[in-house]
């Protein structure tokens, strides 16, 4: 990545697009604090995460960031409800089981709560992953190709779930995708090519137009990024 600079207002939905190898997943990893930039800074929720140590970064991610992986990353020895409850239990939530059940109901999996990942279809596993990502009510949700392993019908259902939960929880949603339909449903699209930010467009931008026109204070921005490069080269999406 080279000289990537942008701000994301709170509650905005953003798609990161571009060909394989353009740096999309690397950018998302930097935003999540999973990678470190070689120069520049990244602020999430007004906090510079590039200055954080690993233990503090882990706590910050647990409290502030939800992450959805293309390959689900469910714990195979835990049931659906147990997978969703894990981040809640780690954060000390007393109602972990109840909250997990509510989220699985919200994604249409009330009858599959006690099933293990191997007993679930790909679409069902991704819905469990979506529920888990929203479990701790994170102000920031990052998703790496959330529909990449799903057929078009199931992928469309997952998109609807993401947007519905986004509206209900007022979460800022940033996702990497090759799916043109998914990208067009976002309020803003960042396009990368060869590690550079090629374009920053707002095809369906409405809610945040006034913020962009008048400017916003740092507390109104959930993400601010100004980086020259990352610790590793831009990688192809798998």
Question: Where do the language-model regions lie?
Answer:
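Conserved beta-strand-loop-alpha-helix hinge in the C-terminal portion
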Residues: 196-221, 235-237
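ABC family nucleotide-binding domain
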Residues: 1-185, 189-192
């Amino acid at each position: 990545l080279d000289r990537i600079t942008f701000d994301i207002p709170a509650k905005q939905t953003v798609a990161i697009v571009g060909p394989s190898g353009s740096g999309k997943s690397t950018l998302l990893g930097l935003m999540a604090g999973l990678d470190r930039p070689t120069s520049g800074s990244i602020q999430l929720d007004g906090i510079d995460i590039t200055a954080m140590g690993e233990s503090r970064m882990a706590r910050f991610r647990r409290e502030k960031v939800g992450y959805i992986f293309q390959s689900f990353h469910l714990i195979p020895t835990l049931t659906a409800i147990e997978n969703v409850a894990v981040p809640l239990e780690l954060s000390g939530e007393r109602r972990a089981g109840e909250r997990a059940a509510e989220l699985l109901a919200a994604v249409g999996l009330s009858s599959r709560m006690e099933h293990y990942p191997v007993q679930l279809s790909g679409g069902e596993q991704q819905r469990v992953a979506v529920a888990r990502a929203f479990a701790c009510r994170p102000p920031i949700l990052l998703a790496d190709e959330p529909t990449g392993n799903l057929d078009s019908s199931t992928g469309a259902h997952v998109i609807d779930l993401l947007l519905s939960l986004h509206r209900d929880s007022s979460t800022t949603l940033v996702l990497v995708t090759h799916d043109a339909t998914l990208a067009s449903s976002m309020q803003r699209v960042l396009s990368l090519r060869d590690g550079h930010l090629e374009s920053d467009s707002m095809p369906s931008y409405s809610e945040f137009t006034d913020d962009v026109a008048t400017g916003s204070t740092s507390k109104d921005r959930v993400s601010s990024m100004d980086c020259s490069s990352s610790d590793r080269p831009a990688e192809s999406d798998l």
